[in-house]
Amino acid sequence: MKSVRNALNRRAKGEKGFTLVELLVVVIIIGILAAVAIPIYLNQRKAAWNSATESDVKNASIVMETIMTNNGGKVPAAVKTSCGPGATHCDIFDGNEVTVSDGVTLTITPNGTTYQIEGSNNNDLNCKTYTYDSATGSITHN
């Protein structure tokens, strides 16, 4: 208790600056905030990568439906089966392009009148893989 009084007396006499205890409290608070904020930031980044992958798969399915409409309901034999990573625009067939996000790889598996599009993100190995199946019209992820 005496040391606290001495510190207060010194401060009252005009000494300026922070005490060691005050500095330690600030460092501890910053450490706690960092421990909470960093995992949240990493999860948000992963969610953004998953969202980009899902969006690219949806966009590729729209391009594929356009191609099939122009080809009598069938998937052309010359359709490109893989896009990305690193390609920003991917020409799937005859000028029908899809924009591919950074790190996303799209794989198209044609099967006559149906197809599947699988999208994965190389930015993080724990990202989801999205699969669009034209037979069901749905996107699944794992």
Q: Model-predicted segments: where are they?
A:
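Periplasmic/extracellular, small/polar-rich flexible segments of pilin-like filament-forming proteins
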Residues: 62-142
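N-terminal single-pass transmembrane signal-anchor helix
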Residues: 13-41
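Extracytoplasmic/periplasmic mature domains of Sec-exported, cell-envelope-associated bacterial proteins
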Residues: 19, 54-62
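Hydrophobic core positions within the conserved protein kinase catalytic domain
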Residues: 5-8, 45, 64
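N-terminal leader/signal peptides at the extreme start of proteins
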Residues: 1-18
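Aliphatic-rich helix starts adjacent to a transmembrane/signal segment
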Residues: 11, 42-57, 71
